[in-house]
């Protein structure tokens, strides 16, 4: 269930992240820094109210939102977008409207958080392990 996402997570593996960042327009210098980072995500859930704090050694971003309600989001790379989140089965889906549109999903499978990032025909998979 989506509530299993609550907690603190650290990146364990990443596939196709550089291609995803290129597809959303991230410049080379920022891509190099992001590829070298090992982010943590701290997810808090209170009913339909969620917050996600993503931290690296060079940047921290916080988003707070209510499931089903559109909100303004500034992404880690500085893009300003409109986002709506929803629950789909055991996953929390972020539908990001900007230039370009993208979809991020988070779901716990086998005790790990699987984060799938999609833009156009590019798919990135990032696996996080729970931090005790």
Swiss-Prot record:
<dbReference type="GO" id="GO:0016020">
    <property type="term" value="C:membrane"/>
</dbReference>
<dbReference type="GO" id="GO:0008289">
    <property type="term" value="F:lipid binding"/>
</dbReference>
<keyword id="KW-0813">Transport</keyword>
<dbReference type="InterPro" id="IPR000463">
    <property type="entry name" value="Fatty_acid-bd"/>
</dbReference>
<protein>
    <recommendedName>
        <fullName>Sodium/calcium exchanger regulatory protein 1</fullName>
    </recommendedName>
</protein>
<feature type="binding site">
    <location>
        <position position="126"/>
    </location>
    <ligand>
        <name>(9Z)-hexadecenoate</name>
    </ligand>
</feature>
<keyword id="KW-0963">Cytoplasm</keyword>
<dbReference type="Pfam" id="PF00061">
    <property type="entry name" value="Lipocalin"/>
</dbReference>
<dbReference type="InterPro" id="IPR012674">
    <property type="entry name" value="Calycin"/>
</dbReference>
<comment type="subunit">
    <text>Interacts with Na(+)/Ca(2+) exchanger NCXSQ1; ReP1-NCXSQ phosphorylation does not affect the interaction.</text>
</comment>
<dbReference type="GO" id="GO:0005737">
    <property type="term" value="C:cytoplasm"/>
</dbReference>
<keyword id="KW-0472">Membrane</keyword>
<dbReference type="InterPro" id="IPR000566">
    <property type="entry name" value="Lipocln_cytosolic_FA-bd_dom"/>
</dbReference>
<comment type="similarity">
    <text>Belongs to the calycin superfamily. Fatty-acid binding protein (FABP) family.</text>
</comment>
<feature type="binding site">
    <location>
        <position position="128"/>
    </location>
    <ligand>
        <name>(9Z)-hexadecenoate</name>
    </ligand>
</feature>
<dbReference type="InterPro" id="IPR031259">
    <property type="entry name" value="ILBP"/>
</dbReference>
<keyword id="KW-0597">Phosphoprotein</keyword>
<comment type="function">
    <text>Binds and may transport fatty acids such as palmitoleate. Also binds poly-phosphoinositides including phosphatidylinositol 4-phosphate (PtdIns(4)P), phosphatidylinositol 4,5-bisphosphate (PtdIns(4,5)P2) and phosphatidylinositol 3,4,5-trisphosphate (PtdIns(3,4,5)P3), and phosphatidic acid. When phosphorylated, stimulates the activity of optic nerve Na(+)/Ca(2+) exchanger.</text>
</comment>
<keyword id="KW-0446">Lipid-binding</keyword>
